[in-house]
Amino acid sequence: MSKEIKFSSDARSAMVRGVDILADTVKVTLGPKGRNVVLEKSFGSPLITNDGVTIAKEIELEDHFENMGAKLVSEVASKTNDIAGDGTTTATVLTQAIVREGIKNVTAGANPIGIRRGIETAVAAAVEALKNNAIPVANKEAIAQVAAVSSRSEKVGEYISEAMEKVGKDGVITIEESRGMETELEVVEGMQFDRGYLSQYMVTDSEKMVADLENPYILITDKKISNIQEILPLLESILQSNRPLLIIADDVDGEALPTLVLNKIRGTFNVVAVKAPGFGDRRKAMLEDIAILTGGTVITEDLGLELKDATIEALGQAARVTVDKDSTVIVEGAGNPEAISHRVAVIKSQIETTTSEFDREKLQERLAKLSGGVAVIKVGAATETELKEMKLRIEDALNATRAAVEEGIVAGGGTALANVIPAVATLELTGDEVTGRNIVLRALEEPVRQIAHNAGFEGSIVIDRLKNAELGIGFNAATGEWVNMIDQGIIDPVKVSRSALQNAASVASLILTTEAVVANKPEPVAPAPAMDPSMMGGMM
């Protein structure tokens, strides 16, 4: 395929047009009075959303050069979403502002490399000032405030703060669709995995069809148990202790399963068998997690261990285990807290180094199960369109809340970015680096201007007053009042503001220093074949 190439100002101008088209579409959603954008879907009803990254991903422009500019801004939104989970619209607005001011100066003859150095220095100073202004998020009320601001719903804020209180900041909080109209929270404490009992005759409550084991021993193995003789010595030892047993194995079949069921029915001892969770290497890792959580050992050939040689010392223990037909929950495992903490640290490091989104998701699930539990927010709505929009808002709120707990909070509504202007303005730079610094100074005002504009106010008047206000005092665009943003619960996580600014500056600098753009030349549309005269028959 032949290529089309544009150079210097032509190349940059085409990309900037794409940046503006995407940013102008996304920025109308910013702030409490932000509007929605309707996205056409190939199948089903249109999606109505105010989620910046969702909108950015949908935009595809016909002109290849403009499309590259749009895609670079979309990358800013995606990267910010990956790191902080929110702030995608702010990142888009900042990118457009830096590119717009930068292009003016490059066109006027400024050195793009000098501008880039100035931008990088200014952003580093702004980030440092943001961190210095941060307030730690320590209590349930503060968490609820962050979630409520992001989701625009106090009820959602309460659900998320309650979920984080129950399962901890590393716990898994999943968002599912409810069968009803109401949104509700469901919390499963302890480690849960998706494997149920192998026989319904193992239940202890025939009405609820669940097996409850109090203070059980837990046999953990990646082997298949077919011959009861393999575990007979172990069963005899457990029988003397008069405690129930949970067997987690690759499978239990052959004569072993009916023998266990028969002894359960006769009341000889209480036993429940389940299949090991996961597959392949992930199964081995999950079994090791369970062993560390319960203080047991995985009986596996990898360690040279055989079932017939297993003793009670190799078994895990827990305060309670509940098993139904689909899942198993282990509560209060008896594992060594230091060993659990070390395992958590290992999984965290794997999350940071993995490049696979699927692997990262599975590692986060394992981390949460070791850390304390799983919370499920079941989203209810009247229509499918409303349900999709609500799920996106709750996902944003959850991500923003995690970010707030991690790095603290600052005043919201774009106020925090405006508050760091003095720290950037005092930087002593020379040459075109000064121009780069001034570009960042102007960009830091842009989120406040856009939020005010979307709410029907004049942005320049708001920013002028904000520059002279005390730290933390800002403009509440929802009411049109000047308030203490922190006291009013109008807050942003530092991680969100920081990531938005850093990612915006990074991509904007790349666009400013671009000197040539190579794109695929559009394929000419082939003319329709001429009609065969013989096919025209009596038409002549």
From Swiss-Prot:
<keyword id="KW-0413">Isomerase</keyword>
<feature type="binding site">
    <location>
        <begin position="29"/>
        <end position="32"/>
    </location>
    <ligand>
        <name>ATP</name>
    </ligand>
</feature>
<keyword id="KW-0963">Cytoplasm</keyword>
<protein>
    <recommendedName>
        <fullName>Chaperonin GroEL</fullName>
        <ecNumber>5.6.1.7</ecNumber>
    </recommendedName>
</protein>
<dbReference type="InterPro" id="IPR027410">
    <property type="entry name" value="TCP-1-like_intermed_sf"/>
</dbReference>
<dbReference type="GO" id="GO:0005737">
    <property type="term" value="C:cytoplasm"/>
</dbReference>
<feature type="binding site">
    <location>
        <position position="413"/>
    </location>
    <ligand>
        <name>ATP</name>
    </ligand>
</feature>
<comment type="subunit">
    <text>Forms a cylinder of 14 subunits composed of two heptameric rings stacked back-to-back. Interacts with the co-chaperonin GroES.</text>
</comment>
<dbReference type="GO" id="GO:0016853">
    <property type="term" value="F:isomerase activity"/>
</dbReference>
<keyword id="KW-0547">Nucleotide-binding</keyword>
<dbReference type="GO" id="GO:0051082">
    <property type="term" value="F:unfolded protein binding"/>
</dbReference>
<dbReference type="InterPro" id="IPR018370">
    <property type="entry name" value="Chaperonin_Cpn60_CS"/>
</dbReference>
<dbReference type="GO" id="GO:0005524">
    <property type="term" value="F:ATP binding"/>
</dbReference>
<keyword id="KW-0143">Chaperone</keyword>
<feature type="binding site">
    <location>
        <begin position="86"/>
        <end position="90"/>
    </location>
    <ligand>
        <name>ATP</name>
    </ligand>
</feature>
<dbReference type="GO" id="GO:0042026">
    <property type="term" value="P:protein refolding"/>
</dbReference>
<comment type="similarity">
    <text>Belongs to the chaperonin (HSP60) family.</text>
</comment>
<dbReference type="InterPro" id="IPR027409">
    <property type="entry name" value="GroEL-like_apical_dom_sf"/>
</dbReference>
<dbReference type="InterPro" id="IPR002423">
    <property type="entry name" value="Cpn60/GroEL/TCP-1"/>
</dbReference>
<dbReference type="InterPro" id="IPR001844">
    <property type="entry name" value="Cpn60/GroEL"/>
</dbReference>
<dbReference type="GO" id="GO:0140662">
    <property type="term" value="F:ATP-dependent protein folding chaperone"/>
</dbReference>
<keyword id="KW-0067">ATP-binding</keyword>
<comment type="function">
    <text>Together with its co-chaperonin GroES, plays an essential role in assisting protein folding. The GroEL-GroES system forms a nano-cage that allows encapsulation of the non-native substrate proteins and provides a physical environment optimized to promote and accelerate protein folding.</text>
</comment>
<dbReference type="InterPro" id="IPR027413">
    <property type="entry name" value="GROEL-like_equatorial_sf"/>
</dbReference>
<feature type="binding site">
    <location>
        <position position="492"/>
    </location>
    <ligand>
        <name>ATP</name>
    </ligand>
</feature>
<dbReference type="Pfam" id="PF00118">
    <property type="entry name" value="Cpn60_TCP1"/>
</dbReference>
<feature type="binding site">
    <location>
        <begin position="476"/>
        <end position="478"/>
    </location>
    <ligand>
        <name>ATP</name>
    </ligand>
</feature>
